[in-house]
Amino acid sequence: MLEKILRTIQEKICLQQYIMTLHAEEEMEDDDSSIYDIENGILTGEILERQKDQTSAESKYRIRGETVMGEGIEIIVKLGATAKVVIITVYALLGEEGGNEL
């Protein structure tokens, strides 16, 4: 099931059917990441876990992948009400190469 959700998220990223929260944009800037790093992280990544929002009961997904330079990055996303991917937050995995070694 998570593979199907990941493919859907990745397809929407390729079609640029996503939005970023202000928080995600701020975190991206703080980590000196670019939108290309975020997109690449999702496209090369895998879902580590599904989380449930306590208030809304919405599912969100923690994805670990690679930046364009091969560094580790994690992105929290959800599928929004408008059928776009909502990028909630992002964070660089400092000192970690590659995104899929667990």
Tell me what each language-model feature is.
Residues 1-102:
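Ribonuclease/tRNase effector modules and their secretory precursors
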